[in-house]
Amino acid sequence: MYTLTLRRFRKGDEFAVSDVICTTLAISNQADYSPEFIEENIRSHSPEVIAARAEEAHFYVALDGETIIGCGGITGYWGSKEESYLTSIFVLPDYQGKGVGRKIVETLEADEYFHRAWHTEVGSSLTAVSFYRKMGYAFKNGITDTDEYGVVRLEKRKEQ
């Protein structure tokens, strides 16, 4: 049994968050991506990159007690106030399938960046597509294949 809490990212969290992301990439994504692709992604999630990303987004961490076990952020899509983008949503493999990812997405969808936007997008790994589909995200423009960055674009639109 674990005790799940979520809170906003704090300075100093970037080291544990980087570890969560790199561990998850290395273990959970190995069935869908090449070792070279995973290694490139791990290099792009250093503590410095995470700290910068957290300054640009509303970034949250999921904790079991005091241990960071997951993370995720939401930001304006290319600076837009009408569109948002979910970023860096990861859950340690040992906690996957236990509601942590769902709670992270629900927290992001309760954030002001989600509420002000008519459209929210996420670039999903192949590994996580079914998770986002369960959370109500649809394939952007009906495209189910990965893009040039190796992700599948999904979106959620508010009824207009």
Which residues does each PLM region occupy?
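Conserved N-terminal entry element of GNAT/NAT acetyltransferase domains
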Residues: 1-15, 157-160
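Acetyl-CoA-dependent GNAT
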Residues: 8-12, 19-93, 105-106, 145
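Conserved acetyl-CoA-binding loop of GNAT-fold acetyltransferases
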Residues: 133-143
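Terminal substrate-recognition subdomain of acyl/acetyltransferases
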Residues: 145-160
